[in-house]
């Protein structure tokens, strides 16, 4: 299976510094800063990228589960709202709210919701965010 990468460079202090985040595929490269993360400044932030990853994975996984259940979707749209809050002298992602909609011929609301609940438990990004070991390699330059 595929291994994917993302990278980031940060220059300067927390509040005055700036950085760039990149996807290994080259599909995205964007600036981020204290302002884009904790205020409403221009640029992206880690939580926004986590939200996009969760929404993208969830939509694909739900379409797959619906198809396996005999109800191929015409369209699945998901928004993930990632909440970052102060905690223990730092910050913590406290919740991710998923809102998903599907155009799925021949399925009722109850079965659609059942498939969405199954997907919440099996989507690879959802599983990773529920608790994944983080391995660290640190090198001082």
Regions found by a protein language model. Give the residues of each.
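Extended beta-strand/beta-hairpin segments
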Residues: 1-52, 59-141
């Amino acid at each position: 299976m595929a291994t994917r990468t993302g990278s980031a460079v940060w220059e300067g202090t927390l509040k005055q510094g700036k950085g760039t985040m990149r996807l290994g595929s080259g599909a995205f490269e964007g600036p981020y800063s204290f302002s884009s993360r904790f205020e409403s400044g221009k640029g992206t932030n880690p939580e926004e990228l986590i939200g996009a990853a969760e929404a993208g994975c969830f939509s694909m996984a739900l379409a797959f589960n619906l198809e396996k259940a005999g109800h191929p979707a015409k369209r699945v749209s998901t928004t993930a709202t990632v909440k970052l809050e102060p905690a223990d002298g730092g910050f913590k992602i406290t919740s991710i709210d998923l809102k998903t909609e599907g155009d799925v011929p021949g399925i009722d609301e109850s079965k659609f919701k059942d498939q969405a609940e199954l997907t919440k438990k099996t989507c690879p990004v959802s599983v990773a965010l529920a608790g994944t070991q983080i391995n660290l390699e640190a090198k001082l330059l």
